[in-house]
Design a protein with these regions (language model features):
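Core segments of small alpha/beta cavity-forming domains
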Residues: 43, 47-60
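A cross-family detector of function-defining hotspots
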Residues: 22-31, 55-204
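Hydrophobic membrane-insertion alpha-helices, especially the h-region
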Residues: 3-23
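Extended non-catalytic domains of envelope/secretory-pathway proteins
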Residues: 5, 30-31, 35-39
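Acidic/histidine-rich, surface-exposed loop or edge segments in extracytoplasmic proteins
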Residues: 36-47, 137-146
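Generic structural "secondary-structure junction" signal
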Residues: 36, 48-51, 71, 150
Length: 204
């Protein structure tokens, strides 16, 4: 009786996994954060994305997932200096077996981002991020990607980072818990946090 019950339970579990897998397919990506190259024209390529060339729409196809879109507002003392970024956020990606997040910045002029900010129904000086509707985001899906931020769910640690990327050209101590390592030739900045996941920022 117990054996029959266990077999039935295993069959039901397998069916549930199959159904969930169809609704939320998990795509395995073989990219690694140290797999960085340059095109003949000097554009940086990482995670299958060529900065300044690959579009947001193309990244959605290659990553096999629909991102969340956020408009980030960087407040300063002067509204003239206020800056904005439109970011596509891909959560729960599986990259080389590691649950990860990719944040792709749209390559858009500040005047366009300012217009997008002005069109928001509600705004607050204290708020730093705003969710953007799929309809509004679709209007900018042909924009190229300006930068990539890779946030793994694990910390690689300084030793592995040096093994993979080499010694940083410049190291800065931001605070007691944050360090910044710079690899300008690679177009890479690594932020090492004592209490959070590392951040790998790729720019041209």
């Amino acid at each position: 009786m117990n054996r029959t019950f266990l077999i039935l339970l295993m069959v039901i579990s397998a069916m549930l996994i199959a159904v969930l897998g169809q609704k939320n397919p998990t795509v395995q990506h073989k990219y690694t954060p140290w797999d960085i190259s340059r095109t003949e024209s000097g554009l940086l390529k990482a995670f299958g994305i060529t900065l300044g060339e690959t579009t947001i729409k193309e990244s959605e196809i290659s990553l096999g997932k629909t991102p969340e879109i956020e408009l980030l507002s960087f407040n300063t003392d002067s509204s003239i200096d206020q800056r904005y970024e439109l970011v596509a956020i891909y959560k729960d990606l599986i990259i080389s077996g590691v649950i990860s997040e990719l944040r792709l910045t749209y390559q858009l002029e500040q005047r366009m981002l300012q217009a997008l900010y002005s069109s928001l129904p509600t705004k607050s000086p204290a708020k730093e991020s705003y969710n953007i509707s799929p309809e509004v985001a679709a209007a900018h899906s042909s924009a190229a990607i300006a930068s990539i931020t890779y946030v793994p769910s694990i910390n690689y640690g300084e030793e592995i980072i040096i093994q993979r990327f080499g010694t940083p050209e410049k190291a800065e101590v931001i605070s007691d818990v944050v360090k910044k390592w710079l690899y300008p030739v690679m177009g890479l900045e690594i932020q090492l946090h004592a209490n959070q996941s590392e951040r790998f920022i790729y720019t041209n």
